């Protein structure tokens, strides 16, 4: 197992301890000081995130496994977002499957029942056979675990870009439901509690936290990938929820394994653990391997002595291993024993106080152009629409209706929608925009929060909270670090503006190949929202009016049009007040039952939003002169991706205008019965070929 600590960090350890640590202690420090566990290159900036709010029950707190939001009537939702990027690049099936399993265990560690999953996947171009292999196995792994354990995958994203050729991104978000007075902490508050482990410890996942904290080397790193067992995971899920009121704290044994789980759960107290008592899957494991193994389907409990027997009996009923391996103590030292000898004895504050780094920052030099590409209307439409594809091939492999709480199916709307036990509806949406982030990560950070807010509004929901995942290359590279810091600034600003506090998140650095080529900056957020009144299930009605809410701007840089034909102009600025006002208007129109279709304008611009109507078997006709804009140029009118805009379908546009209160509103066209025909300024274009491609592309290329 490799030690990833720098020479500076190793010397710092020696100075603080006034001695040379042994091998087991070096592995312990390496795991807890890894970027994956310590956030040593990011924590300084993450403190700018808003984490408090009216509905926040558990926010960004050290060592809590998930955030919690109040959804009324004594109920809370628990939110978590994680990735398994590095493991999925090596073993995509198990990497993705264990990513789902880890999220499930993070949710149940709060005493919550998992009710929904979202997956956000990014791989390279599918013309590359390896990328097809990655995608096929990533989807299979997610489906295998989610379907087997009985938690629906209700939505997500699927995106392709060459920057992910060697580094796929596999993000999974989970939501659970729990009575808010039954939320279980992940840390202990008093000594004397017994440390109980459930599950068998094996050789898989050795050094996984350190593996996730460096770039892929091209060497055989399969041993750092954990093996998924959803059937064991189902036992862990059910029994953990059964005994949740009998324990004082719960923690998933995830990144860094037992040594990280015990240290974080101790939360500054001490712990004494006997490794001889840890149930093993493989005989003769070395103590160092027991310490940092990341074998899946294991949990750690802090239990009062009088409840230990009841907790273990519940697991042993299913022949699932359960053992008392130690105790939390007042003395702030983490100690591990093996064979009657003390092999680790380290101060808690040393382990939980890694050095913090602020690396050099340098603004990337981007090649800018003001030269507009020369392209015709029909050529541009066909090029854009050919990039927009149905994700049905992926989500058809998931059981998205298990549990009977799914209200809107994947692909049916811009947001997932699930029912809660109190009768309310919860909306969920994940958003990222790597193309924009590659141009301006500050505006990108703001825009992904704003887009998620609009996505929720399009089904009738108002955002209440956010979890984030920040995925970048090597933080020691000044241009990468600049993008990272600026993305945080944008996300923080927008989250404060929309009153959607960030209740949890993750940072993933070193997403680059062995040549040092990094992915595009990919900050991702998942926003949760509540329906206060009515929700919208989109339908397209012939002769209804296509009404544009919002103002279109000549801001083309970072757009899908720019990606295809060449970037030019300025990046779209996130004007958060416009997003807020437009979103509130759409929610009000849904509640007033004055619209029957709503779609925010984002990737691909207005044309892409109109395409979501065309694929439903109708036609559209619009006049570009009716589009409120700062330009007469048809290209930005059709393809700009600036925010604050929706298209809605209505039979009463005058009502919308009366309710708009200063927001730009314009009837730009009508729905026709001419299937697959888009008519723009009296020019008809048949896009039935692109509609066929939309439905069939993934099925054909992945066959």
Swiss-Prot record:
EC number(s) from the headed UniProt entry: 6.3.5.3
Pfam families: AIRS, AIRS_C, FGAR-AT_linker
Keywords of the record: ATP-binding, Cytoplasm, Ligase, Magnesium, Metal-binding, Nucleotide-binding, Purine biosynthesis
Pathway(s) it belongs to: Purine metabolism; IMP biosynthesis via de novo pathway; 5-amino-1-(5-phospho-D-ribosyl)imidazole from N(2)-formyl-N(1)-(5-phospho-D-ribosyl)glycinamide: step 1/2
Sequence positions that bind ATP: 39, 80, 468, 505
Annotated substrate binding sites: 83-86, 105, 226, 294-296, 508
GO biological process: 'de novo' IMP biosynthetic process
Residues that, per the record, bind Mg(2+) 2: 106, 252
Gene3D superfamilies: PurM-like C-terminal domain, PurM-like, N-terminal domain
Domain of life, per lineage: Archaea
Catalytic activities: N(2)-formyl-N(1)-(5-phospho-beta-D-ribosyl)glycinamide + L-glutamine + ATP + H2O = 2-formamido-N(1)-(5-O-phospho-beta-D-ribosyl)acetamidine + L-glutamate + ADP + phosphate + H(+)
CC annotations in GO: cytoplasm
Keyword ATP-binding: yes
Residues the entry annotates as binding Mg(2+) 1: 82
Classification via CDD domains: PurL_repeat1, PurL_repeat2
Subunit structure: Monomer. Part of the FGAM synthase complex composed of 1 PurL, 1 PurQ and 2 PurS subunits.
Purpose of the protein: Part of the phosphoribosylformylglycinamidine synthase complex involved in the purines biosynthetic pathway. Catalyzes the ATP-dependent conversion of formylglycinamide ribonucleotide (FGAR) and glutamine to yield formylglycinamidine ribonucleotide (FGAM) and glutamate. The FGAM synthase complex is composed of three subunits. PurQ produces an ammonia molecule by converting glutamine to glutamate. PurL transfers the ammonia molecule to FGAR to form FGAM in an ATP-dependent manner.
Similarity section: Belongs to the FGAMS family.
Protein name as it appears in the record: Phosphoribosylformylglycinamidine synthase subunit PurL
Protein's organism: Sulfurisphaera tokodaii (strain DSM 16993 / JCM 10545 / NBRC 100140 / 7)
Gene: purL
């Amino acid at each position: 197992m490799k030690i990833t600590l720098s020479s500076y960090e190793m010397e710092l350890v020696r100075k603080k301890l006034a001695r040379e640590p042994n091998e087991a202690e070096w592995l312990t420090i390496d795991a807890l000081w890894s970027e994956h566990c310590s956030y040593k290159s990011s924590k300084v900036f993450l403190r700018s995130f808003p984490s408090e709010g009216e509905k926040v029950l558990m926010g960004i707190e050290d060592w809590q496994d998930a955030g919690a939001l109040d959804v009324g009537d004594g109920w809370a939702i628990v939110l978590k977002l994680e990735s398994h990027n590095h493991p999925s690049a090596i073993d995509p099936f198990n990497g993705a499957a264990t990513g789902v399993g880890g999220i499930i265990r993070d949710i149940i560690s709060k005493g919550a029942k998992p009710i929904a999953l979202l997956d956000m996947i990014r791989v390279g171009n599918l013309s590359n056979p390896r990328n097809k292999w990655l995608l096929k196995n990533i989807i299979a792994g997610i489906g295998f675990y989610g379907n087997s354990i009985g938690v629906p995958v209700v939505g997500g994203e699927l995106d392709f870009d060459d920057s992910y050729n060697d580094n796929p991104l596999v993000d999974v978000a989970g939501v659970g439901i729990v009575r808010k007075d039954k939320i279980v902490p992940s840390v202990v508050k008093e000594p004397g509690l017994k440390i109980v482990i459930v599950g068998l410890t094996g050789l898989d996942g050795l050094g996984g936290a350190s593996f996730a904290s460096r770039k892929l080397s091209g060497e055989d790193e399969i041993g750092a990938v954990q093996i998924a067992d959803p059937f064991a995971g189902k036992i862990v899920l059910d029994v953990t929820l059964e005994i949740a009121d009998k324990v004082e704290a719960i923690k998933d044994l995830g990144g860094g394994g037992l040594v990280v789980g015990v240290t974080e759960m101790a939360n500054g107290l001490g712990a004494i653990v006997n490794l001889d008592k840890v149930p093993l899957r493989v005989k003769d494991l070395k103590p160092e391997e027991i310490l940092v193994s990341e074998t899946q389907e294991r949990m750690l409990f802090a239990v009062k002595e009088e409840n230990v027997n009841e907790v273990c009996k519940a697991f042993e009923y299913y022949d699932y291993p359960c053992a008392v391996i130690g105790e939390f103590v007042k003395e702030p030292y983490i100690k591990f024993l093996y064979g009657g000898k003390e092999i680790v004895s380290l101060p808690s504050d040393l382990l939980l106080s890694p050095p913090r780094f602020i690396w050099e920052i340098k603004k990337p030099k981007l090649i800018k152009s003001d030269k507009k590409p020369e392209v015709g209307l029909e050529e541009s439409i066909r090029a854009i629409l050919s990039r927009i594809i149905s994700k049905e091939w992926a989500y058809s492999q998931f059981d998205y209706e298990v549990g009977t709480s799914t209200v809107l199916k994947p692909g049916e709307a811009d947001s997932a929608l699930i029912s809660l036990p109190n009768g309310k509806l919860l909306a969920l949406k994940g958003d990222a925009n790597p193309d924009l982030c590659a141009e301006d990560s500050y505006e990108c950070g703001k825009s992904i929060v704003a887009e998620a807010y609009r996505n929720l509004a399009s089904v009738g929901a108002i955002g209440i909270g956010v979890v984030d995942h920040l995925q970048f290359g090597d933080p020691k590279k000044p241009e990468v670090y600049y993008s990272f810091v600026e993305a945080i600034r944008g996300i923080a600003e927008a989250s404060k503006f929309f009153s959607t506090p960030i209740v949890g998140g993750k940072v993933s650095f070193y997403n680059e190949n062995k040549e040092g080529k990094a992915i595009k900056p990919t900050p991702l957020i998942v926003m949760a929202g509540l329906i206060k009144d009515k929700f919208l299930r989109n339908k397209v009605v012939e002769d209804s009016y296509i009404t544009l809410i919002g103002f279109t701007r000549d801001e083309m840089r970072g757009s899908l049009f720019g990606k295809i034909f060449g970037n030019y102009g300025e990046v779209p600025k996130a004007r958060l007040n416009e997003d807020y006002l437009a979103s509130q208007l759409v929610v009000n129109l849904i509640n007033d039952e004055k619209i029957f279709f709503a779609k925010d304008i984002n990737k691909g611009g207005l044309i892409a939003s109109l395409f979501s109507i065309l694929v439903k078997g109708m036609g559209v006709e619009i006049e570009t002169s009716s589009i409120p804009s700062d330009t007469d140029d048809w290209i930005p009118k059709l393809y700009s991706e600036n925010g604050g805009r929706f298209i809605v379908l209505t039979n009463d546009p005058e009502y919308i205008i009366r309710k708009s209160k200063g927001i730009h509103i314009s009837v730009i066209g009508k729905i026709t019965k001419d299937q697959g025909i888009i008519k723009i300024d009296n020019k008809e274009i048949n896009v039935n070929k692109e509609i066929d491609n939309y439905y069939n592309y993934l099925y054909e290329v992945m066959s």
